Amino acid sequence: MQGETRSISFDGREIRLTTRRYAPQAGGSVLIECGDTAVLVTATRANGREGIDFLPLTCDYEERLYAAGRIPGSFMRRESRPPERATLACRLIDRPIRPLFPSWMRDDLQIVATVMSVDERVPPDVLAVTGASLATLLAKIPFYGPMAAVRVGLLGDDFILNPSYREIERSELDLVVAGTAEGVVMVEAGAQQLPEEDMIEAIDFGYEAVLELIRHQKETIAELGIEQVVPEKPAEDTTVPDYLAKQCTKDIGAVLSQFTLTKAERDSQLDSIKAKAAEAIAALKETDAVRAAVSSNGKLLGNSFKALTKSMMRAQIVKDGKRVDGRSLDQVRPISAAAGVLPKRVHGSGLFQRGLTQVLSTATLGTPSDAQEMDDLNPSNEKHYLHHYNFPPYSVGETRPMRSPGRREIGHGALAERALLPVLPPKESFPYVLRVVSEVLSSNGSTSMGSVCGSTLALMDAGVPIAAPVAGAAMGLIREGSEVRVLTDIQGIEDFLGDMDFKVAGTEKGITALQMDMKITGLAMKTIGEAVTQARPARLHILEKMLEALDKPRDTMSPHAPRRLSFRIDPELIGTVIGPGGRTIKGITERTNTKIDIEDTGIVTVASHDGAAAEEAQKIIEGLTRRVSEGEYFDGKVTRVIPIGAFVEILPGKEGMIHISQLSDQRVEKVEDVVNVGDEVRVRVREIDNRGRINLTLRGVPQDGSDPQPTVILPIGES
């Protein structure tokens, strides 16, 4: 079980690649290590499936909490459903590697990345992407690789490769670039309103590092004596495609050039043309080659018709510069936007529509206890801003069972979440947990960017003081030979038949989120730069339309949103506020009908639907944590009487005792002769003993309202 280990130097670090030791029955496996982070990646190929017309590729990213020396917190104490960040890592592997398999492949493929050990200085996700490529090469699966990925951060004016978790938190940029020797195949980024030129430079910086990792992969398989399997497309029977080209080209061209057709009308006419072709084929002799081919493969006619439509639409864009809806290449579809479309029981709402894509977003304000706890390998264990994306079947006119969110929904929600994070107020000044839900009511392309726009409107409608509004647009690409056309605001058919889906979100100042997926094996940096640059005027146009609906965050929140106060106390006094067994804080919440959260740093957050109740709770806590000095005067209320004295509440939640000898300058036989429960008295702090107990006195303290003035008045709500 010795295996083969190869060490490579990359950006001043050592990366170790161990092959032929682990998972011997997998098609290919590699343990890729950097620092104390180790990821085992396997690639396995099974026999092909009959009757399918897609590549059955599955990518899995498995986090094991033993990798961080932890035991799962679930009842069964084992990992269950993958956490959200693991799902996003699955997509990070899938998106760059899927276009590198030949489109005609029908074999079952599975790539599994298992995090075996994690080092906070080396996030494992980009190692898993590079490992997936090497494992595929080792499995001798036909593949247009190698492919590799790196993460790029920006600290000050310097780009850094593969930053640590802590560096990512401080970085103005969190960018993942994946590519082949031919070009970039995937980009994923979150940024602090980064200018377009800086983003382009960062992608270029990352791609140069990707090329180095590709070289190391080639050297590794060469040392192992493995020859890469280059995909060889099998010979195709062109009988049916040639027949359709002859019979349908004119009719399809007429439909694609009717720019006033709606999506439904265009789809209906194309379906009609396909149905007529099917009827014509059915009328052919049984011995005819076309009829025989269609009869032997139930999906051949549909796939051939789709391929013909795709090539004609692409040719129309490249040659004529016209899209199926008549727009120019850089034109955005008609936009409408509205804020506050739902009753104020919903804290904030926004409706955004672009063409036939319509998204309704809602914003809900919560308390710190509503934050999402993340039970995964990432050191960051809480989320205070959540974005959830829902894509019901009716949004595309279909029927299917309603199930829990899939990887696509989770990925789209994360992208929209990342786009808004840079403009949200810090929790110190706006101590709310925020949840935005985007309901896709109608889909015809770019629903994730519609969710970004709807989220902005919903947050502003909820009174969240965001730093700037955020909008987004999806860019597309058609590449035919040396001819390349970049499309602004692609709709569904252009996404489906095009070569790229490039989503860019940001403010007027710069980019906050970016995601690029390819259907080709690489894109030149020049074209990426054109797409990023072309997205800016589209984004500014969309922002202008959104601001016509609501130009700034509302000054007031929904009356049904919780009112919150945030203040700081001495961390050493947190125990005083909580009390034995939590009795003190429980008593405050019950008395004031509020929700109280205390952080280890001493930040206290009080939430209530009644502002006065929140203020009362604040006064009680401040009273509990206020340091009392000897000689101070207070107005207070007698709360208890005992034979040797009386207790007086001098601050909310804080009592002192007047010994019977301190009730008067004269001898007092019975405490009740001077004070009774409920009496309001002015007292002076006589001393604070070594156990922190406050001893009070009435002796020499005027009770007629004359000076000296008390330091603190009675608690709020008392009389």
Curated annotation (Swiss-Prot):
GO terms, biological process: mRNA catabolic process; RNA processing
Cellular component aspect of the GO annotation: cytosol
UniProt catalytic activity: RNA(n+1) + phosphate = RNA(n) + a ribonucleoside 5'-diphosphate
GO MF annotation terms: 3'-5'-RNA exonuclease activity; magnesium ion binding; polyribonucleotide nucleotidyltransferase activity; RNA binding
Cofactor or coenzyme needed: Mg(2+)
CDD domains the record matches: KH-I_PNPase, RNase_PH_PNPase_1, RNase_PH_PNPase_2, S1_PNPase
InterPro entries given in the database record: ExoRNase_PH_dom1, ExoRNase_PH_dom2, ExoRNase_PH_dom2_sf, KH_dom, KH_dom_type_1, KH_dom_type_1_sf, NA-bd_OB-fold, PNPase
Keyword Lipid biosynthesis carried by entry: no
Signal peptide start-end: none
Spans annotated as Disordered: 699-719
A Pfam family reported for this protein in Swiss-Prot or TrEMBL: RNase_PH
Domain annotation S1 motif: ranges: 631-699
Major localization class: cytoplasm
Positions contributing to Mg(2+) binding: D495, D501
Keywords linked to the UniProt accession: Cytoplasm, Magnesium, Metal-binding, Nucleotidyltransferase, RNA-binding, Transferase
EC number: 2.7.7.8
Entry's localization field: Cytoplasm
Similarity remark: Belongs to the polyribonucleotide nucleotidyltransferase family.
Entries under PANTHER family matching the protein: POLYRIBONUCLEOTIDE NUCLEOTIDYLTRANSFERASE (PTHR11252), POLYRIBONUCLEOTIDE NUCLEOTIDYLTRANSFERASE 1, MITOCHONDRIAL (PTHR11252:SF0)
Database matches in NCBIfam families: polynuc_phos, PRK11824.1
Entry function: Involved in mRNA degradation. Catalyzes the phosphorolysis of single-stranded polyribonucleotides processively in the 3'- to 5'-direction.
Protein name: Polyribonucleotide nucleotidyltransferase
Protein source organism: Synechococcus sp. (strain RCC307)
